[in-house]
């Protein structure tokens, strides 16, 4: 209570105090970052190149979004009766999301890898697509997924994945989540340069 000299209240006064509280003002994790647009024409150019060159996985974009990197790839796999030896893939830092555009396939996933062997640092996939990781002979107690057009699947970093059968082909858009930023950046200009190469 604050006293007033001419009131019936106490004639003494308390000093006036103002409480100041620190406020946590939310800030974006990526300050001033532009959006990255990819046209269907550009994606189709990657698909055409993949089919013509039998090139399975191509990075379309890889961008910094603040606390993480995000990449978009176009993947096209031809018919597969059975997998090649030691073709289970695992990525240490990069998680992947597949959205199937066309075709169908059987994919096995799981974290318990059998006879895993590190990929060399010079491997093109390690350098350009999904960072350090391993290949393995098989997946112990793996889960089987029957993928078809329209489906999506999330494969966390450290989870092995293996296509055991591809009926005719499978084409999917790949989203890579790269929190440790192990994958090199690729912007629109770099993409155009890549596509222009013969």
Regions found by a protein language model. Give the residues of each.
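A short, N-terminal "cap"/entry segment at the start of jelly-roll beta-barrel domains
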Residues: 20-92, 185-193, 197-198
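His/acidic/aromatic-lined binding-pocket segments of jelly-roll/cupin-type domains
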Residues: 89, 95-99, 144-145, 152-153
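Short, conserved beta-strand element in jelly-roll/cupin
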Residues: 92-107, 111, 122-133
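Short, structured beta-strand/loop micro-motifs enriched in basic residues and often containing a Trp
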Residues: 131-141
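Conserved metal-binding segment of the jelly-roll/cupin
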Residues: 146-160, 164-166
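A short hydrophobic beta-strand segment most commonly corresponding to one strand
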Residues: 168-184
């Amino acid at each position: 209570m604050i006293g007033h000299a001419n009131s019936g209240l106490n004639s003494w006064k308390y000093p006036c105090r103002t409480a100041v509280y620190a406020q946590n003002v939310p800030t974006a994790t990526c300050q001033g970052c532009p959006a990255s647009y990819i046209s269907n024409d550009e994606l189709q150019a990657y698909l055409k190149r993949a089919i013509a060159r039998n090139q399975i996985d191509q990075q379309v974009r890889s961008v910094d979004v603040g606390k993480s990197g995000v990449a978009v790839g176009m993947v096209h796999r031809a018919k597969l009766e059975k997998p090649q030896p030691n073709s289970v893939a695992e990525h240490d830092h990069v998680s992947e999301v597949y959205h199937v555009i066309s075709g169908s396939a059987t994919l096995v996933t799981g974290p318990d890898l059998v006879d895993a062997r590190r990929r060399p640092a010079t491997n093109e996939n390690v350098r350009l697509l999904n960072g350090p990781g391993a290949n393995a002979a098989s997946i112990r107690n793996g889960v089987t997924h029957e993928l078809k057009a329209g489906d999506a699947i999330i494969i966390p970093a450290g989870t092995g994945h293996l296509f055991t059968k591809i009926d005719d082909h499978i084409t999917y858009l790949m989203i890579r989540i790269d929190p440790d930023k192990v994958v090199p950046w690729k912007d629109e200009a770099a993409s155009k340069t890549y596509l222009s190469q013969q």
